[in-house]
Amino acid sequence: MIGPSDPLPGDPFTERRSRMIKAMKFVSIPVRDQQRALEFYTTKLGFRVVTDQPFSGEQRWIELGVGRSGTGITLFTPPGHEERVGTFTGISFVADDVKATWRELAAKGVVFIQEPKEEGWGTSAIFADPDGNQFVLGSG
């Protein structure tokens, strides 16, 4: 059986597709204090450290793994982009049970901007990190 990413027999675009974008490696979350952010994301959200090493100036390159996702998260603010800290990121995390996850995270001190709400597509909530960056927590 052929899957959605398998080349079709006789497909003239097979070679070209093999050079195209295949995955997302990481997204960056702008933070003011990398150590405080690292503690929040690992102790409260349960993310794992993939890389933590010196990078540029006083900053470190901190990359975190999230569950089974192949996409990592970096806690990094490029110089000159400090205005991005504390914004709505557009990043959405998935939980099997949004309400149970909301209760667990709230008990750990995670601040929720919006409590779980039933939508036509599922359940969602919005939470913030210590810098005010906002994220959606949604059902699969």
Residue ranges and their predicted role:
Residues L64-R68, F127-P130, S139-G140:
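Active-site beta-strand termini and strand-to-loop segments that position acidic
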Residues V31-Q35, G86, G90-Q134:
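Vicinal oxygen chelate
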Residues P54-S56, E82, E118-E119:
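A short beta-turn/loop motif at secondary-structure boundaries
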